[in-house]
A protein has these predicted regions:
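Extracytoplasmic small-molecule ligand-binding "clamshell" domains
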Residues: 20-99, 168-171, 256-257
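Solvent-exposed, polar/charged alpha-helical surfaces in well-ordered, non-transmembrane soluble domains
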Residues: 53, 57-61, 81, 85, ...
């Protein structure tokens, strides 16, 4: 899900000079304090297994500082009770344009996806308007943009809704949706690409279909930034420089996890040599 879920120009010294680096007064010198969900795979967890954990490590490495997390389940009040309360200084994945925070430059762009069985009746499907969906059962996360597209296509009656805002320590709507797909309770699952892509990599019998052919509104593709407190301009410039210098490393991690990435023309990036 969109952490619905980026961007950082101070030049920092070498590792040998880390203790002498100047960091903005509003963030913690010597430590990158990241706000994160403790059970939100494939994005983050306390074991450091998510792709946002890996990206946080890249940022800390470039800054030559230690990495520390402040853990809180995502949901209403997440920004207020993390960044706002100054327990941490950076959210690794945040949709561009979202209010409440200041954003870095986007560091990747992704898209919502359909997930179907490779050998099933929907194999080769490319868009929601495909007539084969008319009599199929469609799993959809409530309140996400694809739900509006399905409504416009008259497919709401065919949908099985899954919750958007949950405590991922207790339940996982995405895993439930994929289980229902594998078990035959639904015929197609629709998920945010950075969530669906890594799940599909674990199931060879499933196919990920980026929704690249849908109408523009509401958007199906989103730019992801990093988020920080408003008015921390020096910190924003610092992180933007990190993102620029380590873009290739970040893209490599995202592709390794199976996150579908788009270039500026809306085409899929298939190697870490592609543009952000």
């Amino acid at each position: 899900m969109i952490p619905f879920a980026v961007a950082f120009g101070l030049l920092l010294g070498s590792a040998a000079g880390a203790s002498a680096q100047h960091l903005p007064d509003l963030v913690t010198p010597g430590t990158l304090r990241v706000c994160a969900d403790p059970a939100n795979m494939p994005f983050s967890n306390k074991k450091g297994e998510g792709f946002e954990n890996r990206i946080a490590e890249i940022v800390a490495d470039e800054l030559k500082v230690s990495l520390r997390y402040y853990w809180l389940p995502q949901g209403p009040g997440f920004v207020r009770n993390t960044l706002g309360a100054r327990y941490c200084d950076l959210i690794i994945g945040y949709a561009a344009g979202t209010e409440l925070t200041q954003h870095t430059n986007p560091y990747y762009r992704s898209v919502f996806t359909m997930i179907v069985r490779r050998d099933g009746p929907l194999a080769g499907i490319e868009e929601l308007a495909d007539p084969r969906l008319r009599d199929k059962r469609i799993g959809i996360v409530e309140g996400t943009p694809p739900a509006d597209h399905l409504a416009d296509l008259g497919l709401v009656a065919r949908t099985t809704p899954y919750s958007l805002l949950v405590d991922r320590r207790i339940e996982s709507p995405a895993d439930e949706m994929i289980s229902d797909l594998l078990g035959g309770k639904i015929d197609v699952a629709i998920l945010w690409g950075p969530l669906g892509g890594p799940i599909v990599r674990k199931h060879a019998e499933l196919q990920l279909v980026p929704l690249l052919r849908e109408k523009e509104r509401p958007p199906m593709a989103y730019r992801i930034t990093m988020a920080m407190r408003p008015n921390e301009l020096e910190w924003k410039h610092t992180i933007n420089n990190v993102l620029r210098r380590r873009q290739a490393d970040i893209v490599k991690v995202l592709l390794e996890y199976g996150v579908p990435l788009l270039d500026e023309e809306g085409g899929l990036i298939t190697s870490d040599d592609g543009p952000p």
